[in-house]
């Protein structure tokens, strides 16, 4: 990692040593291990508003927000109250509950094209189930996905995935057989002409196109104007379904997610959506949903099987309902403004130190590519950055009490709890971090190593 000298964190270091003895790599999701930036991961013991506190008693301004879910900030009173009330009533029943009906109704109300929705436990389950449903509905097998887009760790979608696969520099992953990905076509993101060419050749075999509504697992790479609408058009022409992965963008970009800022305005809709993160309020909850005729193929109404013992868990549902109900227009305005503030502070500091970088955003999701490129529109562009400079920047900010994603290929997040005091702390820390990044010798571009949905 060049000139990076991670600071000491004795309690976290001891916890990490213990974890490595009993947990593969010492963590339960790869990007948390700090492999992309070096040093020892911080073991957090509490969160409050925009802050995290680690096992050594140090407090950090949190710009990860649990990889997106904590849009209200940590330990928001309404969420804590709802979860406490739910726990006191029992943790799981294995039956339908009133809360899951209310959460489904709220999702359907907020995202117009979603006529019916099924609750699950993770984004991976949601995308896996949506792909199975698309195949069952169309009677076709082929799926188109885009390099650098991450749709969970389901085998068929791990080909050229972003997030953790990118963070660790893995081309793919052992254990995923050729048979598992034989029906997956991976294309460059934002290249509509190539998608059209593949449809022209194989359109009658393609069940669905799955895409992140705005890519945020190779760093943040928004869709080029017309790209998502073009996918909709091609799917219509060839009888395929369009699946919008809004696990990261859903209910964070707006009340109706990325679709609310694009498709709703342009008058087009995906056939299926996947959701997660914000909709669970920090607890394990996700969903997939869409057109009623497509969802009608799902068991027990139809023949496409999907199930889950803990799906619709009452505690997760309570957290999700409380979070979504608290996400008012004022909350979204605050989050949007704070994202602009942080991006501006960091970009100014890097510019003043002559560090080549490219800020990139999709709504309130943002990241920085350490590159002199004028634009990054796909995975290849995201990979061609100087990630060692990010590592130096990361550790300087960490030492100053600012917690960033431990990978150059992950999105940054803010919450409605981030206030002027947090902006002042970030502004105070950024110049030294920019100097640390500038001190790293200009390397040859290195392959990306993104995280994975934390």
UniProtKB/Swiss-Prot annotation:
CDD domains: OAT_like. One of its GO terms (molecular function) is transaminase activity. GO terms for cellular component: cytoplasm. Keywords: Cytoplasm, Isomerase, Porphyrin biosynthesis, Pyridoxal phosphate. Gene3D superfamilies: Aspartate Aminotransferase, domain 1, Type I PLP-dependent aspartate aminotransferase-like (Major domain). It catalyses: (S)-4-amino-5-oxopentanoate = 5-aminolevulinate. It is found in: Cytoplasm. Its EC number is 5.4.3.8. The modification N6-(pyridoxal phosphate)lysine is found at residue 277. SUPFAM superfamilies: PLP-dependent transferases. Homodimer. NCBIfam families: hemL, PRK00062.1. This is Glutamate-1-semialdehyde 2,1-aminomutase. It comes from Frankia alni (strain DSM 45986 / CECT 9034 / ACN14a).
């Amino acid at each position: 990692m060049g000139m990076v000298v991670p600071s000491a964190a004795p309690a976290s270091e001891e916890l990490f040593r213990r974890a490595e003895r009993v947990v593969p790599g010492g963590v339960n999701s790869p990007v948390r291990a700090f492999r992309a930036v070096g040093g020892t991961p911080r073991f957090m013991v509490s969160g409050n508003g925009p802050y995290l506190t680690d096992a050594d008693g140090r407090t950090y301004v949190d710009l990860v927000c649990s990889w997106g879910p904590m849009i209200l900030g940590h330990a928001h009173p309404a969420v804590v109250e709802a979860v406490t009330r739910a726990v006191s009533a029992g943790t799981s029943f294995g039956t339908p509950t009133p809360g899951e009906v209310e959460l489904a109704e709220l999702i359907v109300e907020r995202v117009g094209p979603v006529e019916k929705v099924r609750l699950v436990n993770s984004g991976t389950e949601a995308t896996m189930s949506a792909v199975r449903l698309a195949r069952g509905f169309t009677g076709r097998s082929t799926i188109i996905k885009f390099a650098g887009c991450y749709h969970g760790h389901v085998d068929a979608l791990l080909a050229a995935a972003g997030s953790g696969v990118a963070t660790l520099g893995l081309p793919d992953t052992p254990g995923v057989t050729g048979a598992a990905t034989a029906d997956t076509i991976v294309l460059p993101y934002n290249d509509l002409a190539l998608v059209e060419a593949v449809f022209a050749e194989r359109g009658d075999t393609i069940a669905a196109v799955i895409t992140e509504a705005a890519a945020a697992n190779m760093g943040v790479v928004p869709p080029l104007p017309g790209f998502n609408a073009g996918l909709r058009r091609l799917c219509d022409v060839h009888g395929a379904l369009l699946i919008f992965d809004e696990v990261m963008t859903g209910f964070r970009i707006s009340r109706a997610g990325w679709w609310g800022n694009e498709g709703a305005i342009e008058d087009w809709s995906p056939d299926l959506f996947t959701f997660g993160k914000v909709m669970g309020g920090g607890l394990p909850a996700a969903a997939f949903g869409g057109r009623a005729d497509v969802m009608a193929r799902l068991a027990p109404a139809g023949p496409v099987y999907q199930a889950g013992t803990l799906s619709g868990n009452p505690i997760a549902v309570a957290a999700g309902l409380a979070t979504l109900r608290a996400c008012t227009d004022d909350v979204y305005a605050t989050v949007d403004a704070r994202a602009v503030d942080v991006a501006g502070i960091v970009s100014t500091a890097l510019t003043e130190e002559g560090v080549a970088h490219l800020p990139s955003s999709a709504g309130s999701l943002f990241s920085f590519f350490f590159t002199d490129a004028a634009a990054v529109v796909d995975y290849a562009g995201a990979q061609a950055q100087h990630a060692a400079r990010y590592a130096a920047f990361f550790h300087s900010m960490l030492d100053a009490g600012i917690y960033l994603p431990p990978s150059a290929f992950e999105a940054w997040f803010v919450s409605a709890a981030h206030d002027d005091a947090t902006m002042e702390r970030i502004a105070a820390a950024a110049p030294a971090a920019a100097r640390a990044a500038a001190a790293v010798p200009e390397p040859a571009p290195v392959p990306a190593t993104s995280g994975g949905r934390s």
